[in-house]
Amino acid sequence: RLNIPDVRVENGRVLFSGDENALARANMNLRTGERVLLVLADFKATTFEELFQGVYRTNLEDFIPKDGNFPVKGHCLNSQLMSVPDCQAIVKKAASKRLGEKYGVSWLPETGAKYQLQFSIMNDRVQLYLDTSGPGLHKRGYRAVGNDAPLRETLAAAMVQLTRYRGRDFVWDPFCGSGTIPIEAALIARNKAPGMYRRFAGEAFAWIDPSVWGDVRAEAKDKEFNGKYRILGSDNDPKCISLSIANARKAGVADCISFRDGDATKMDLPAQEGVIICNPPYGQRMMEQKDAQRLYAAFGKHVR
C-alpha cells in the first residue's frame, strides 16, 4: 500500500494526486504499472495553433531547467490531429519558445538531464506529461538477458497478484524460462520493492531533492519481510535454469526460490496443494502447435 489519496481509475491508467514523495514511492513500489507520468497540462485542440498555444501556456519552466534536455514523443487517437510527427514538432516548438522566453535566451543547449515530454491526443483532448520513470517500470534491473520468449515483469507480477498470493502457499511455475514469475512471486512474498535495484529519470530532476529518493528506498527496505517461502521454478532447458538462478540472485531473492531442471509432465512435487502460475509454450516461438497441445494434455493429466 502506497497510502496515496485521491486515486481514480480510467481506461488503461490510474490517476492520483500527491507530492514528490508520492511520485517517488509510486516509481519505487508499483509492480504492474509501466510508467509514472506527471500531468503538466490538459486542454482541447483541434488545430495545430490550438495545440501550440496550449503547450505554450504551460508552466514548463517549473519543471525543466535552462539546460534541460526535453525530447518529445506521443500518440494520437480519434482526433482531428492525427499526425504524430507533426504534433511532436508543434509541441517541441511551443515548449522551446516558452522556455526560451522564460530563461531569456534564443537558444536552449539541452545539455543537462533528460526531461522526457509525452503527449496524448484522444478525442481532441490533449494531455501533456513529464515522464518521471525513464525506462519502463517492467525493467526491474535483475534481468540482463532473457530466454527466447521472455515475459514482462509487470505482467508476471499481475499474474501472481491475480492468485492473491501473499507468501503462504506453494507456488510452481513449470515453464519458468528466465525465472520471471517465480522471482516476481518472491518479491511479493518478501514485500520487496520492485524498483529497489534500478534508477529513475526523476532522480535527476532539479526540483526533486535527492533525499526524497534516499528516504523512499530506506522506507521500502524497512518494509521487507524475511521468511521461508515455497516457490519452485522448473524448466526442461538447463540453460534456462542457470539463467533463472542468476536473475534471482540479482533480484535478491535467490534464497526464496528453488529451481529445478526437469519435465513438467513427470516431475514429483514437494506439495499436494498450491498455485500453478505459468506462461506455457503456445506453439508460436517455442514449439509447434501440435507439440504444445500434446504438452497441455500430458501436463493436465499429471497435475490432476
Regions found by a protein language model. Give the residues of each.
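S-adenosyl-L-methionine
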Residues: I4-E34, C76-D86, I121-R168, I183, ...
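Glycine-rich S-adenosyl-L-methionine
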Residues: M287-V303
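Residue-level signal for inorganic ion chemistry
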Residues: V72, F119, N279, F299
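A short acidic, Gly/Pro-enriched loop at the edge of an enzyme's catalytic core
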Residues: T265-I277
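Conserved S-adenosyl-L-methionine
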Residues: L151-D268, R285, D291
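Low-complexity, glycine/alanine/valine/leucine- and proline-rich hydrophobic stretches
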Residues: F259-R260, I276-C278
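Non-catalytic nucleic-acid substrate-recognition regions in nucleic-acid-modifying enzymes
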Residues: L2-Y115
